């Protein structure tokens, strides 16, 4: 099935809480994950909550990477949404799993913007759809 985007939603469990509460570490890890996925970084925003926790997003030309952390539980919710067929979202997630020391990861994958459901002829598409199996 052809789609415009590929989204992976991941739950990271048993992470190193000190990394999840460090806004600079989280920012650097997310930017490196975007680079490892071959994304073109446009901008980023991250916020450290008091007393702990970080939320942030890296906006990339191909869509986004987002994270919300709960260091007190060793947990992070990660979202990688990419468009096109040269981006490697799995590479981003594998890097983040290692960076945060996740002991367990649960993922759910979705195809976003299913071309067949749009009723738009392939030759009229402005974005090259990812070929998601």
UniProtKB/Swiss-Prot annotation:
The record marks 62-63 as: Cleavage (non-hydrolytic). Keywords: Autocatalytic cleavage, Decarboxylase, Lyase, Polyamine biosynthesis, Pyruvate, S-adenosyl-L-methionine, Schiff base, Spermidine biosynthesis, Zymogen. It catalyses: S-adenosyl-L-methionine + H(+) = S-adenosyl 3-(methylsulfanyl)propylamine + CO2. Disulfide bonds: none annotated. The modification Pyruvic acid (Ser) is found at residue 63. Catalyzes the decarboxylation of S-adenosylmethionine to S-adenosylmethioninamine (dcAdoMet), the propylamine donor required for the synthesis of the polyamines spermine and spermidine from the diamine putrescine. This is S-adenosylmethionine decarboxylase proenzyme. The lineage of its organism: Bacteria, Pseudomonadati, Pseudomonadota, Acidithiobacillia, Acidithiobacillales.
């Amino acid at each position: 099935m052809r789609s415009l985007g590929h989204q992976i939603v991941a739950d990271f469990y048993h992470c190193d809480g000190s990394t999840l509460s460090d806004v600079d570490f989280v920012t650097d890890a997310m930017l490196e994950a975007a680079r490892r996925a071959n994304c073109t970084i446009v901008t980023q925003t991250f916020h450290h909550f008091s007393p702990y926790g970080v939320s942030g997003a890296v906006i990339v030309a191909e869509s986004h990477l987002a994270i919300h952390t709960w260091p007190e539980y060793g947990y992070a919710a990660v979202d990688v949404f990419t468009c096109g067929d040269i981006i490697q979202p799995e590479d981003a997630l594998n890097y983040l799993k290692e960076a945060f020391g996740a002991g367990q990861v649960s993922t759910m994958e979705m195809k976003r913007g299913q071309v067949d459901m749009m009723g738009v002829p392939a030759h009229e598409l402005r974005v090259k759809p990812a070929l998601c199996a």
